[in-house]
């Protein structure tokens, strides 16, 4: 659907192209194509996006809507972020100096206003005091959740062994003889346009789906927590958020569980909302709360950034980078993949895979990977 809408918007070479979250539901390859297209697009583009890498690649100007106003910046996302943070810091520092000066003047006035010999100086300082105006720093509309995954148990050397897994769905071989071993320091990104293959692999590893052939084995020191791509069944209940989360906590205390919810921006009575009434972003934050509460040393994420705002994506990204355990994840956000993964597994359309210990950017630039893709494409054409 997204690709069809993009094709409609791009048809006819418009003078102004308006794009509202164009990268939603696009895989990384499609996003890369869109980036290159927009970079070369000669007319005006106005885009709303939560994808930081995409904004850095495409945008030459940023319109920041915050503090009840719109502020324009020349530059890409990173330049805007650094500039906006610098402006706030400078305002706070300037206000601090003004407050110190105000205190100094008030103390002088209070001390010498009744002293005849100092009355002129006191009056002069009163005038100076009246001229000092503090800059109004309005509260930001941006709220950052606190995401910190802390495993309760250190992971051992034997993490996961996958041997010869195959799976056919609706007559299509989604996974074909997949084998890999996961080490204790791996953060593996599942990439490629074969979305069904990635989700099927996650479901098998989470015990939700049986492979047609092959096997897998988790190490005895591992504990797994899984973020599913489709959470419809999970939230099809009238159970309260706090009650649902408590079942995953060793500490069966509502106050303890509410602490996790508070970090994830569920304030006050939000914790007693029913599961089924939550928005897309709230559902994601509840699932991330569950993963934090469980304290697992292996995290599996299947597209966790869907429905999240930029602040939550940034917080999740930082939490994944800091996590001392193993991560297996699929994600449409280039920056999350690049900054988190130290190993790439690409699932190809024919059900096979490419496995490489590298960062995502290095993987994309690799001649070896380009040759492997070319061989695969030639084989497909021959078939």
State the predicted function of each range:
Residues 1-95, 149-383:
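ABC ATP-binding cassette signature C-motif
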Residues 86-177:
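Flexible nucleotide-interacting loop at or near the entrance of a catalytic core
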């Amino acid at each position: 659907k997204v690709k069809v809408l993009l094709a409609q918007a791009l048809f006819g070479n418009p003078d102004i192209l308006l794009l509202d979250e164009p990268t939603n539901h696009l895989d990384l390859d499609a996003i890369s194509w869109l980036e290159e297209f927009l970079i070369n697009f000669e007319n005006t583009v106005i885009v709303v996006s939560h994808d930081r890498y995409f904004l850095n690649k495409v945008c030459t100007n940023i319109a920041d809507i915050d503090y009840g106003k719109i502020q324009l910046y020349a530059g890409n996302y990173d330049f805007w972020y650094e500039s906006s943070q610098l402006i706030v810091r400078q305002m706070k520092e300037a206000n601090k100096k003004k407050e110190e000066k105000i205190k100094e003047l008030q103390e002088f006035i209070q001390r010498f206003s009744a002293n005849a010999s100092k009355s002129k100086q006191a009056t002069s300082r009163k005038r100076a005091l009246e001229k000092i105006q503090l800059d109004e720093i309005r509260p930001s509309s941006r709220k950052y959740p606190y995401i910190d995954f802390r495993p309760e148990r250190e992971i051992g050397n034997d993490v996961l062994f996958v041997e010869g897994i195959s799976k056919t769905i609706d007559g299509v071989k989604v996974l074909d003889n997949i084998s890999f071993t996961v080490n204790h320091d791996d953060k593996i990104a599942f990439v490629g346009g074969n979305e069904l293959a990635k989700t099927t692999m996650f479901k098998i590893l989470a015990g939700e789906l049986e492979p047609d052939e092959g096997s897998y084995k988790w190490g005895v020191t591992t504990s797994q927590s899984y973020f599913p791509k489709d959470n419809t069944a999970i939230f099809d209940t009238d159970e309260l958020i706090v009650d649902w989360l408590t079942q995953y906590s060793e500490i069966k205390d509502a106050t303890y569980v509410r602490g996790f919810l508070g970090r994830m921006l569920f304030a006050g009575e939000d914790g007693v909302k029913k599961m089924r009434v939550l928005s897309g972003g709230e559902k994601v934050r509840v699932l991330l709360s569950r993963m934090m509460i469980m304290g697992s040393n292996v995290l599996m994420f299947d597209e966790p950034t869907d429905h999240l705002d930029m602040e939550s994506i940034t917080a999740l990204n930082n939490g994944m980078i800091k996590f001392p355990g193993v991560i297996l994840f699929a994600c449409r956000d280039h920056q999350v993949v690049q900054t988190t993964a130290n190993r790439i597994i690409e699932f190809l359309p024919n059900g096979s895979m490419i496995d490489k210990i590298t960062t995502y950017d290095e993987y994309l630039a690799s001649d070896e990977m380009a040759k492997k893709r070319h061989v695969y494409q030639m084989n497909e054409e021959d078939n």
